[in-house]
């Protein structure tokens, strides 16, 4: 099975990390979630509805749409909070990345554990910039909003392509494809990881600093 991989890069101020990452992760999961499956008998089922809601950012001029699931939101906020803290405590230049991997399970015979086969991975490379003045922060608030809008549009365009998705499973195989542990929504199986690194390029950060500098010069 071929695994599709997408990479995004963002440059943000420290206080914008959480909102930017939540906007990206929630957007991806909005398009990779379904309502709960309700089986009548094997091969016959109905799918519940998925509620959505708008989220206004506090530190970015941006509003995104997410699945209306408090359980899913709490799970994402937990790992994003850990990533934000790791960035802040790294003592370096604030470089890191988060990966959202979708996978399906392949049952293995005892005593081997099930195999997890990835079919789509989203990686977001993040560079935190330090700003000196409130004027710079206000400009960054606007520019990050514009850039984030471009990223979200790109995500939606990628999601609209007719590429691989796991086939709808039978009732007995549902847990091999979907996360059935949430009460109100059913995302494809996923896992999120992050790392703090000094190996990322700084082209996005350079572009952001240039945008701020050019705006100040107007």
UniProtKB/Swiss-Prot annotation:
GO MF entries: identical protein binding; protein kinase binding; protein-containing complex binding
Region spans: Important for interaction with ATG13: 152-156
Main location: cytoplasm
GO biological process: autophagosome assembly; negative regulation of cell population proliferation; positive regulation of autophagy
Keyword annotations of the record: Autophagy, Cytoplasm
Keyword Hydrolase set for record: no
Any one annotated GO CC term: phagophore assembly site
Subcellular location(s) of the protein: Cytoplasm; Preautophagosomal structure
Keyword flag Cytoplasm: yes
Pfam hit, one: ATG101
Domain of life: Eukaryota
PANTHER family: AUTOPHAGY-RELATED PROTEIN 101
Family: Belongs to the ATG101 family.
Function: Autophagy factor required for autophagosome formation. Stabilizes ATG13, protecting it from proteasomal degradation.
Subunit structure: Interacts with ATG13. Associates with a complex composed of ATG13, ULK1 and RB1CC1; the association with this complex requires the presence of ATG13.
Protein name: Autophagy-related protein 101
């Amino acid at each position: 099975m071929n695994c599709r991989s997408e990479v995004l890069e963002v440059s943000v101020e420290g206080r914008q990390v959480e909102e930017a990452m939540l906007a990206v992760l929630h957007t991806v999961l909005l398009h990779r979630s379904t309502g709960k499956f309700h089986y009548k008998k094997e091969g016959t089922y109905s799918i519940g509805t998925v509620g959505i809601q708008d989220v206004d950012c506090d530190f970015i001029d941006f509003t995104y749409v997410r699945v209306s699931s408090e359980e899913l939101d709490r799970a994402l906020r937990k790992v994003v909070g850990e990533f934000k803290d790791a960035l802040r405590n790294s003592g370096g230049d604030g470089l890191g990345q988060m990966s959202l991997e979708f996978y399906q399970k392949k049952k293995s015979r005892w005593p081997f554990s099930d195999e997890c086969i990835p079919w789509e991975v989203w990686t977001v490379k993040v560079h935190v910039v330090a700003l000196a003045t409130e004027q710079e922060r206000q400009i960054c608030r606007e520019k990050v909003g514009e850039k984030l809008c471009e990223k979200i549009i790109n995500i939606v365009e990628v999601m609209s392509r007719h590429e691989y998705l796991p086939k709808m499973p039978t009732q007995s195989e549902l847990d091999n494809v979907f996360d059935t542990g949430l009460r109100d929504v059913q995302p494809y199986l996923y896992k999120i990881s992050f790392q703090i690194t000094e190996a990322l390029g700084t082209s996005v950060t350079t572009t952001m600093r240039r945008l701020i500098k050019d705006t100040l010069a107007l």
